[in-house]
Amino acid sequence: MIYGIGTDIIQIARVQGVMTRTNGRFAEKVLGPDELAKYHARKARSEKRGLAFLATRFAAKEAFSKAIGLGMRWPMTWRAMELMNLPSGEPTAVCHGELAAWLAERGLVVRVSVSDEHDYAVAFAIAERSGAAVSQPTAL
C-alpha cells in the first residue's frame, strides 16, 4: 500500500553555485560516506558528471523526505539516507541509524528514481508499507 510520494527537481547550476559559495563543503554536508566516495570518483573524471551526481542525490533525498512525510526533520537527515545502485544499475535507498529504525518500525520501503539532463536533475520517491505486520496508531 502506498504510504506517500515525493518528487523534487533542481537546476544543476544552483548546485554549482552552492558548491562555489561553500568551497565544496556542500557535498560533504549532503552526501553519506559511500555517496561521497562515488562523487569524488565521478568528479575526478568530469566536473559536469560530478555536479550531476550531487544534484541527483540532493533531489533524491528531498523526494525521499517528502515521501515518508517528514521533510528534513529528525530522523531524516542528509547523510542518514544514501542513494546507491544495485549491480543492475537500479537505484536503491540505503538508510542508516535512527532513520533505518524509524522506517522499520512503520514497515516502510521506499523506492527512488533519479534522472538528469543538461540543466536539471529530478527525483521521484514512493514509500510503501511492506507486507510485514505493522502496529497501527490507536484512535483517540
From Swiss-Prot:
Catalytic activity: apo-[ACP] + CoA = holo-[ACP] + adenosine 3',5'-bisphosphate + H(+)
Record-linked Pfam families: ACPS
Main subcellular localisation: cytoplasm
Cofactor(s) named in the record: Mg(2+)
Record bears the keyword Cytoplasm: yes
HAMAP family per the UniProt record, alphabetical: AcpS
Protein name in UniProt: Holo-[acyl-carrier-protein] synthase
Species for this entry: Cupriavidus taiwanensis (strain DSM 17343 / BCRC 17206 / CCUG 44338 / CIP 107171 / LMG 19424 / R1) (Ralstonia taiwanensis (strain LMG 19424))
Lineage: Bacteria, Pseudomonadati, Pseudomonadota, Betaproteobacteria, Burkholderiales
